[in-house]
Every structure is written in structure tokens, then in C-alpha cells.
Amino acid sequence: MYKRQLLTKINRDANDIKSTVNFSAKDSMVLSKGNAAHLYGESAIDYQDLKLNSAEIRMNLDSNTVYANGLPDSVGQIEGMPVFKDKSGEYESKTMSYNFKSERGYITGIVTEQQDGYLTGGQAKRMDDGSFFVQDGKYTTCENHDDPHFYFQLTKAKVRPQKDVVTGPGYMVLMG
């Protein structure tokens, strides 16, 4: 006959995330059967020490990934750009994707405060130790970091938050 087995322990998949993911949206949330969620309008995700706010967030819990971007308003200005905050710092960007499990991400249009200045960049890849690699970056101490009067143009850089910035070829740009 058949031997009856009692299930005494649920085997969690190695890909499972370790904590509850809290999420909200001011406008709407669309949840699908495939463990995916689309959040619209002042969206927020809170997971362990990570916080993400953006106008639009797409989340897939099967692959442990999240994608965030701003949305155009009635005159075409992008509003609600992603703001990512964790133990290593706070980052604003145009778009970002992030994996909860590996703690790695890909960011475009990054803006972050480092030491006494601002680092902005075209593309950045965040590593699991909190450091990130930036391509086509700018470092300035000018308060107007969107259109600085002076900056160091960095072809590539590795940033270790609150420690140092190591760059490849770079040059100083002065504007009138």
C-alpha cells in the first residue's frame, strides 16, 4: 500500500527573499497571478533596510527584481524619478532595476552625494557590497549639480560610499 508521509517542514526555495516586502501606491496597484505587481503614482517599496520611491514601479517577486522610473506630466516633464535609499546611501536616478536577493542593480542618470560633493552619471552598476561602477560620470562640489560651473568628467569610476572614488581617465571641465 501507500505509505503516508507527514510534512513537518516547508522547504523554502533558495531564491526566496528573506523578509516581507511592503509596497504601496497612491494611484493604483495591479497585481497578477505570476507574483508581479505594477504600482502607479507615488509608489513605494520597503524591504529590510531598503526604501524605493518612484512614480512607477514594476516588481516581480518570482525573480526578486524591481524596476522603477519616473513618468511624464501633462507638459512632458519627467516627475517622480526613482529615489533609492539603503545603508550605503541615497541615490536618485532616471531609471533603476534592482535584485533583492543579489543586492545588485543597474541605474541610469544617477545623482548621489559623496563626501563634500555630488556624483552624477550616465550608467551605474550597483554591487552587493554597496559600491558601484559609474560610466560617463561627473563629480562636482558645485551646489547646482544638474548644470555645474565646474566638474571632473570621469570616463569610468568605482565608488565606495563614504570611503573613496577611484577613476579611470578623467579631466576637469570649467564653464563660464
Model-derived features: positions:
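Structural signature for solvent-exposed beta-strand/loop edge elements and short helix-capping sites
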Residues: 3-176
